[in-house]
């Protein structure tokens, strides 16, 4: 794959051309100055990010999945974001999935040639039984990675939603997806080291997409992660704290209520705020597809 002279991520950075001559303190300040460009580049993509969130959420309401595909750093960031969704938002591991070129081995070491296999992602998506209601997010700093492009083409062929996240535009990726997200962070501190500014931008965008989708799906109440899975002591304490905050209860009362509701944060909150039984709370949640805000707004409207 020849070097593209239009590629920002592969261009030399004049601000760091002699970074090896700087003192360590100056080096740190120079890298920090470059990093400050990243949030602005991401903020400039607010519109397509919001479009992606709404489109993904709409499909997930009807059984669709969110699937990330990437290679190298981009792939690892997708895996990281997908892995955090079950403990944070109580999703099934099958709802948010990440595919990385080279498979699990590529999480900890480079797998030579994996990103150049344009058919590999298509095969992996076929193994997931990709459906039209799924959403596929291709992540590639350059916007040219064959593994990602092949996966996007496979997704488009069956009518799945396609989203491209790249730090170059125009690029083959951003030009063939339904929604293009392109935070242009400029040349890297070290030429071509896209684990730096490009990777940081990708992480911020993925954070926003997954969090925004889960908020739209009712996985939060305010800023409380009310669908979390309390799988360890820290998360159990967090669940108790969320019930206490949402219902203005002391810690002991919140813990007791949560235990009585089998550890279900949403159920406990509704029991406290609505004065109903746990079973009634579960029924309300089922009718509202788990959206606690929708349940409370509906009940308040009926009581007016």
From Swiss-Prot:
One Pfam family hit: GKRP_SIS_N
Record's keyword annotation contains Membrane: no
Keyword Calcium attributed: no
Keyword terms: Carbohydrate metabolism, Lyase
One GO BP: peptidoglycan turnover
EC number: 4.2.1.126
Transmembrane segments: none
Binding partners and assembly: Homodimer.
Family membership noted in the UniProt record: Belongs to the GCKR-like family. MurNAc-6-P etherase subfamily.
PANTHER family linked: GLUCOKINASE REGULATORY PROTEIN (PTHR10088:SF4)
Misc. remarks from the entry: A lyase-type mechanism (elimination/hydration) is suggested for the cleavage of the lactyl ether bond of MurNAc 6-phosphate, with the formation of an alpha,beta-unsaturated aldehyde intermediate with (E)-stereochemistry, followed by the syn addition of water to give product.
Role description: Specifically catalyzes the cleavage of the D-lactyl ether substituent of MurNAc 6-phosphate, producing GlcNAc 6-phosphate and D-lactate.
Protein name (Swiss-Prot/TrEMBL): N-acetylmuramic acid 6-phosphate etherase
Species of provenance: Synechococcus sp. (strain JA-2-3B'a(2-13))
Lineage: Bacteria, Bacillati, Cyanobacteriota, Cyanophyceae, Synechococcales
Gene that encodes the chain: murQ
